[in-house]
Amino acid sequence: MTKLSVNINKIATLRNARGGDVPNVLEAAKNIESFGAEGITVHPRPDERHIRYADARELKPVLNTEFNIEGKPIQQFIDLVLEVKPAQVTLVPDAENAITSDSGWDTVKHRDYLKEVIAEFKANGIRTSIFVDPVKKMIEGAAETGSDRIELYTESFAVDFEKGNSNAVKPYAECAKIAHELGLGINAGHDLSLKNINYFKENVPYLDEVSIGHALISEALYLGLEKTIQQYLKLLK
């Protein structure tokens, strides 16, 4: 079964909007785990506009499921990950002023850099994943870095699927097969939702994990957090 890791950045965004500690990120994460999620994801950025570096440090000891920290591997981020030692680190090529992640790595151009960073994480017992577009060349490049997994960037699928284009899943299915043949595990994330997750999961083989945040938290405003997570788990079976 494909695992569900819930990205809690939006909970931190809500907290930060008023200052203080409501909603409490740690309590939210523990509730999400109790509702059945198999992992917690955070994506700290240098400006700490949602998840703070301190949140990542405080979350690790209270979590009972896999902890995944995403981010651009600047030195501050690398130091955080090596200190916290999550189950998984996902490397994302965040642009300076981007509101959210908007592209995968060029794993050919940045191969040597990624290889060096990944080796350090793996030496510390941390599973590694690289955020990539569904492009064969980028999947092959990811394998050459020594990464354990890839995370397929799914925005283009979500946008096209919303427009009625069910063929939007084909590049992802093809890249998942290539990744599997190269010995890579397969994660996916970005704009996956209750509307499209089942179709994506049913058509993309070897899918180990999905990381979902914005859509899940938005849907929870209407359905409640527990019910929303339960619906995702049902669709991912």
Swiss-Prot record:
SUPFAM superfamilies: Pyridoxine 5'-phosphate synthase. The keyword Cytoplasm applies. Pathway: Cofactor biosynthesis; pyridoxine 5'-phosphate biosynthesis; pyridoxine 5'-phosphate from D-erythrose 4-phosphate: step 5/5. Gene3D superfamilies: Aldolase class I. 1-deoxy-D-xylulose 5-phosphate binds at R45, H50, T100. Transmembrane segments: none annotated. The active site is at H43, E70, H190. Its EC number is 2.6.99.2. 3-amino-2-oxopropyl phosphate binds at N7, R18, D191, G213, H214. The keyword Transferase applies. The record marks E151 as: Transition state stabilizer. It is found in: Cytoplasm. Keywords: Cytoplasm, Pyridoxine biosynthesis, Transferase. It catalyses: 3-amino-2-oxopropyl phosphate + 1-deoxy-D-xylulose 5-phosphate = pyridoxine 5'-phosphate + phosphate + 2 H2O + H(+). One of its GO terms (biological process) is pyridoxine biosynthetic process. Catalyzes the complicated ring closure reaction between the two acyclic compounds 1-deoxy-D-xylulose-5-phosphate (DXP) and 3-amino-2-oxopropyl phosphate (1-amino-acetone-3-phosphate or AAP) to form pyridoxine 5'-phosphate (PNP) and inorganic phosphate. Homooctamer; tetramer of dimers. Belongs to the PNP synthase family. This is Pyridoxine 5'-phosphate synthase. It comes from Christiangramia forsetii (strain DSM 17595 / CGMCC 1.15422 / KT0803).
